[in-house]
Design a protein with these regions (language model features):
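Non-catalytic DNA-recognition/assembly elements of restriction-modification systems
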Residues: 1-16, 20-32, 119-132, 148-190
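Amphipathic alpha-helical coiled-coil segments
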Residues: 138-152
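A short beta-sheet element
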Residues: 32-94, 103-106, 111-115
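Short, flexible active-site-proximal loops enriched in glycine and acidic residues
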Residues: 86, 101-107, 123-131
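Charged, alpha-helix-forming regions
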Residues: 194-195
């Protein structure tokens, strides 16, 4: 069944500032646009929810956050209604690319009123669970592949040093030159199709 975002969640705001979290030693986590910030003695949300960055850099980025936690004021709570799993709502919101609704040049913002009418297919709870499970598996595979790429990058750098050494030790006795010695700067090419 096609529904709107506003049919499956309520919005709420936070009055917490990042300074409210600094140097506190509470029990309940607080999150900001970049993730975990710290812990305080109270929480705003008793159930799992979705948070979206609504102000500043990273607008539209979403997080699925646990019960008994809070976010700071640059984020907005999207509180799932009884007809949707929090994780399913998270993937729906993430797939909508809500950053397209931004306004403001200096500090971009997005507002619930602008994206609340986005439509998607709401399936039954069993199907939601299946979809969430598949998407989590895909995300895990993507994370593993990205980790593997980082390791390959480190391997390439290490092999390069093994083959050519470093500038400081230059154990192979290579000539040390500046880029101007071995490259030509081409400022402007031909403005016609070359003839071969």
């Amino acid at each position: 069944m096609r529904v709107k975002i506003e049919d499956v969640c309520d919005k709420a705001t936070s009055n917490l500032k990042q300074s409210d979290v600094m140097n506190k030693k509470g029990l309940f986590p607080v999150f900001g646009a970049a993730g975990y910030l710290g812990k305080i003695d109270t929480f705003h949300q008793s159930k799992p929810y979705v948070a979206i960055v609504k102000d500043g850099a990273g607008i539209g980025r979403t997080m699925l956050l646990p019960a008994k936690s809070s976010v700071i004021g640059t984020m907005q709570y999207l509180l799932p209604k009884d007809n949707i799993l929090p994780a399913y709502l998270y993937y729906v919101i993430k797939a909508r690319h809500l950053e397209k609704y931004f306004s403001g040049a200096t500090i971009p913002h997005i507002y619930f009123k602008d994206y609340k009418n986005e439509q998607f297919d709401l399936v039954n709870f069993e199907k939601q669970k299946q979809i969430v499970h598949k998407l989590k598996v895909i995300e895990k595979i993507m994370t593993n592949l990205n980790d593997e790429l980082k390791l390959f990058d480190e391997l390439i750098k290490a092999r390069f040093v093994e083959m050519f050494g470093t500038l400081s030790d230059n154990e192979n006795g290579f000539d040390v030159v500046i880029i101007d010695d071995v490259c030509s700067l081409i400022k402007d090419g031909t403005h016609q199709t070359p003839q071969y």
